[in-house]
């Protein structure tokens, strides 16, 4: 069997950070890497590289994904990005650890019900919360109840890291229904 040509092979990008236009507009002099996290630029990259769909992932830091600095604003921005390019993007809901567990679960419910977001993104190193914390366990319980996938951004560097392998295994075992039926994606 001949090897596939990577350029023409159809692809799914499972983890792309894209900043909303409002953030780019508010920071016109930005010269960091995020200046390239632009939706229109990325759609062109998708066309050039036969990326059929992509998953837009937030950061668990609403200061990067909105100018209102709330999870609700992030969710509206993510929904708008999906709306602009129907059928091209999935988008995962964000969390804001400044909110209580109950407020976060309510925000996730609205993100899925009102904004048609497709899953939940957890980034323990950005949120400062261990993957197996009570806070995140409430999120996993919600995801299991609602049958939505959870993506975990993980780059554990130490045994006790917030996203250490033992925490991932423990969480996957405790949320086995999600892990095996709805998929827990590990990103890193």
Language model features: what each stretch is:
Residues 1-14, 18, 23-53, 158-188:
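Mid-to-C-terminal alpha-helical segments outside catalytic/metal-binding sites
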Residues 13, 21, 29-32, 38, ...:
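Acidic-enriched, low-complexity/disordered segments with a strong bias for Aspartate over Glutamate
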Residues 29-66, 88-96, 118-119, 125:
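Divalent metal-dependent hydrolysis catalytic cores, especially in the metallo-beta-lactamase
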Residues 68-157:
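Active-site gating/metal-coordination segments in enzymes
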Residues 18-20, 61, 97, 127, ...:
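Active-site micro-motifs of SAM-dependent methyltransferase domains
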């Amino acid at each position: 069997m001949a090897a596939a040509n990577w350029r023409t092979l159809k692809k799914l990008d499972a983890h792309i950070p894209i900043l909303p236009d409002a953030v780019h507009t508010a920071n016109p002099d930005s010269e960091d890497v995020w200046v390239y996290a632009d939706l229109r630029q990325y759609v062109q990259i998708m066309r050039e590289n036969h990326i059929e769909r992509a998953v837009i992932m937030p950061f668990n830091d609403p200061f990067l994904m909105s100018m209102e600095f709330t999870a609700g604003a992030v969710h509206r921005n993510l929904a708008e990005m999906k709306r602009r390019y129907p059928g091209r993007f999935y988008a995962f809901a964000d969390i804001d650890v400044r909110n209580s567990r109950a407020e976060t679960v309510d925000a996730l419910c609205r993100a899925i019900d009102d904004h048609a977001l497709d899953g939940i993104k957890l980034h323990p190193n950005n949120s400062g919360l261990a993957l197996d914390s009570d806070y995140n366990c409430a999120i996993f319980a919600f995801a299991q109840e609602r049958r939505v996938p959870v993506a975990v951004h993980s780059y554990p560097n130490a045994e006790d890291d917030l996203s250490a392998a033992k925490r991932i295994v423990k969480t996957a075992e405790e949320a086995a229904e999600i892990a095996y039926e709805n998929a827990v994606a590990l990103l890193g």
